[in-house]
């Protein structure tokens, strides 16, 4: 099991009730996606970012030729019957992240969601197919995924200097959008289509707690123990 998906992490609970081969594939693909997109989100020197992206480009080439080094890609390789498909999607992701290096995320929520969709859609769609099956409502699952990624970015930016951190009203707006979408999805998602739903549920609760504590103390955020979250919906979605 990858370190990013051990007990206590969001990926652990999001994938908990899937069959092993699906669970490990979901976690591996999401870990790789997060690692690549984080290069653009972290405020690092452009030349360093380009070196990291070049490494990932070569790593995807190695994945396609059955010689990956990254733990996530090695785990994914065990179950991936279509390495060329994943390879194309990961190369596209690296290219899109490359175009974003040095650009500040838009402060307009709608534009930011469009940027997230443009960068992540192929990988998110692949994850949706793995987690929800061919008959799942992929558009609904993808909507959750895009909003959840925005929440991820906002929460990550809270560690930046106060002048660069998102305003409280932005956190509140994203949390309300995420909560509203989750409320709709909880009534329409089919049994077992809960990977992105669970990730978003966790972030929704973390955002709620964060906004309550944000003004009082920006530097000390109380994060929800996520082990308490999945118990409440486990029976409802998985029996």
Enumerate the predicted regions with their spans.
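Hydrophobic alpha-helical segments and helix pairs
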Residues: 73-123
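Catalytic cores of Mg2+-dependent Asp-rich isoprenoid enzymes
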Residues: 1-77, 93, 116-122, 138-147, ...
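Classical nucleotidyltransferase
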Residues: 151-157
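Eukaryote-skewed repeat-based solenoidal scaffolds used as protein-protein interaction platforms
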Residues: 127-151
């Amino acid at each position: 099991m990858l370190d990013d998906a051990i007990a206590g992490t969001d990926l652990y609970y999001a994938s908990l009730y899937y069959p092993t081969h699906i669970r490990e594939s979901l976690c591996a693909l999401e870990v790789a996606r997060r690692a690549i997109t984080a290069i653009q989100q972290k405020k690092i020197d452009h030349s360093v970012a380009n070196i990291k992206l070049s490494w990932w480009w070569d790593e995807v080439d190695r994945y396609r030729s059955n010689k990956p080094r990254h733990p996530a890609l090695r785990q994914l390789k065990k179950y991936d019957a279509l390495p060329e498909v994943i390879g194309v999607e990961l190369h596209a992701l690296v290219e899109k992240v490359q175009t974003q290096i040095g650009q500040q995320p838009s402060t307009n929520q709608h534009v930011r969601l469009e940027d997230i969709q443009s960068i992540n859609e192929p990988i998110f769609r692949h994850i949706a197919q793995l987690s929800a099956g061919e008959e799942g409502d992929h558009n609904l699952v993808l909507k959750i995924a895009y909003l959840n990624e925005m929440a991820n970015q906002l929460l990550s930016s809270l560690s930046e200097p106060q002048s660069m951190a998102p305003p409280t009203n932005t956190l509140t707006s994203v949390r309300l959008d995420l909560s509203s979408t989750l409320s709709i999805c909880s009534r329409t998602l089919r049994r077992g289509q809960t990977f992105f739903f669970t990730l978003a549920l966790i972030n929704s609760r973390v955002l709620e707690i964060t906004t309550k504590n944000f003004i009082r103390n920006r530097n000390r955020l109380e994060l929800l123990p996520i082990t308490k979250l999945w118990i409440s919906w486990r029976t409802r979605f998985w029996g």
